[in-house]
Regions:
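N-terminal assembly/interaction segments in proteins that build large macromolecular machines
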Residues: 1-172
Length: 172
C-alpha cells in the first residue's frame, strides 16, 4: 500500500497513537519526501507506453526510471499504463507549468489581470486573484497538476511520487 517496511509502518503507528489513517498519511508524506530527494538522480531507463481508444485517440508516453530492472517491474508498467489512460482522457497540453512558454504565461497573466481590474476588484487583491486564476488554468492543462483520473483526490504528480516511493527510484 505504501511501500515502506514493517518497522517503518510500526513506527508510524506508534507516532500517531495507533491511528491507522494518520499513520498512512504520515508514511505517504515520508515517501514523498524520499521521492523529492531521488528527483536529483538521472533516469536513463524506461518504457514508452501506448494506448489507443476506439481507433480514434492514440497516446504515446515516455516514462523513464533509473534501471532496466525497475522498467520491467509490474508496478512501473502499471504506472505507465495509468499515465497513458490519463493522458488519453484528459488531453494535457504540457507536462508541467515549467514547460509553458514564458510568453504564453505572461499573456495569460495580463489577460486575467485586465479581467480582474474590469470587474472592479480591489487593486491590492488583484495579484493574488490573478495567481489563483493562473494556477487553476494550468491545473487543467498541465499533466502533473491535473487531478489523477483514477483518484481525483490526488494529482498525477502525487501519483508518480507514490510510485517513486514504492519503487525506490526516480521516475520522470
Amino acid at each position: 500500500l505504501t511501500g515502506v517496511g514493517i518497522t517503518d509502518a510500526n513506527m508510524a503507528l506508534v507516532e500517531t497513537d495507533g491511528d491507522f489513517d494518520k499513520a498512512l498519511e504520515a508514511m505517504r508524506k515520508k515517501g514523498q519526501t524520499k521521492a523529492e530527494k531521488r528527483g536529483e538522480r538521472e533516469a536513463r531507463s524506461g518504457v514508452i507506453g501506448s494506448y489507443v481508444h476506439d481507433n480514434r485517440i492514440g497516446v504515446l508516453v515516455e516514462v523513464n526510471c533509473e534501471t532496466d530492472f525497475v522498467a520491467r517491474n509490474e508496478k512501473f508498467t502499471d504506472l505507465v499504463k495509468d499515465v497513458c489512460l490519463h493522458v488519453a482522457a484528459s488531453a494535457p497540453l504540457y507536462v508541467s507549468v515549467e514547460d509553458v512558454p514564458a510568453k504564453e504565461r505572461e499573456a495569460l497573466a495580463k489577460e486575467f489581470k485586465d479581467k480582474v481590474v474590469a470587474e472592479g476588484k480591489p487593486a491590492d487583491k488583484a495579484d493574488m486573484i490573478v495567481e489563483g486564476m493562473l494556477k487553476k488554468h494550468f491545473a487543467e492543462r498541465c499533466l502533473l497538476d491535473q487531478p489523477f483520473i483514477k483518484n481525483p483526490d490526488q494529482t498525477v504528480d502525487q501519483y508518480v511520487k507514490e510510485g517513486i516511493a514504492i519503487l525506490g527510484e526516480n521516475i520522470v
